[in-house]
């Protein structure tokens, strides 16, 4: 990054992301202090980064208060066993659509797939679920796993989560 900085390239977000990784991997820092330090860093995806740490460390999500916009975390929260962040209308709509909350949202979600799941749930059709793919907004590459940095063009914070409606299956997807 120093070489790029000398050429007047914008490296602030990358340096913040690297700091977050260093803080997250510091074994001497208590978990709560890690989250507090990372939350103060300013890079796209900091909220998701903290949420990933909560999940990785098996911390209860009740202690998490910096939820990212649902567009940045829908794939993480989709399989949560219980509803979280219900004061946010988008989170509320998703958990209502999944049947994990009885609190019907007051307005439609801005994500079409969530609205479709809610309509199917209300109509008694419960055989739908969401699957996710990840696309870089800069180079348009599509990958199977989320990454904070595009694995093709290396752009930080450019991965978009795309939800698709698919059919629920009773199988676990393992080969014989």
Spans of features found by a protein language model:
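Short helix-capping/linker segments at secondary-structure and domain boundaries
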Residues: 58-62
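Cys/His-clustered metal-coordination modules, chiefly Zn-binding fingers
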Residues: 73-176
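Amphipathic alpha-helical repeat scaffolds of TPR domains
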Residues: 11-22, 44-57, 82, 92-96
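Alpha-helical repeat scaffolds
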Residues: 1-19, 28-41, 63-81, 87-91, ...
């Amino acid at each position: 990054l120093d070489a790029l900085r000398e050429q007047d390239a914008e490296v602030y977000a990358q340096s913040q992301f690297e700091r977050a990784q260093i803080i997250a991997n510091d074994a001497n820092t208590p978990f709560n202090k890690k989250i507090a330090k990372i939350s103060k860093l300013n890079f796209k995806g900091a909220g998701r980064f903290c949420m990933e740490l909560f999940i990785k460390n098996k911390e209860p999500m009740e202690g998490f208060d910096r939820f990212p916009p649902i567009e940045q975390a829908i794939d993480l929260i989709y399989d949560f066993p219980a509803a979280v962040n219900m004061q946010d209308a988008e989170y509320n709509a998703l958990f209502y659509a999944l049947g994990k909350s009885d609190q019907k949202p007051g307005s439609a979600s801005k994500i079409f797939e969530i609205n479709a799941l809610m309509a199917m749930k209300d109509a008694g059709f419960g055989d739908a679920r969401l699957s996710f793919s990840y696309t870089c907004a800069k180079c348009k590459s599509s990958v199977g796993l989320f990454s904070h940095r595009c694995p093709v063009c290396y752009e930080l914070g450019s991965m978009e989560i795309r939800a698709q409606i698919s059919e629920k299956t009773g199988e676990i997807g393992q080969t014989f």
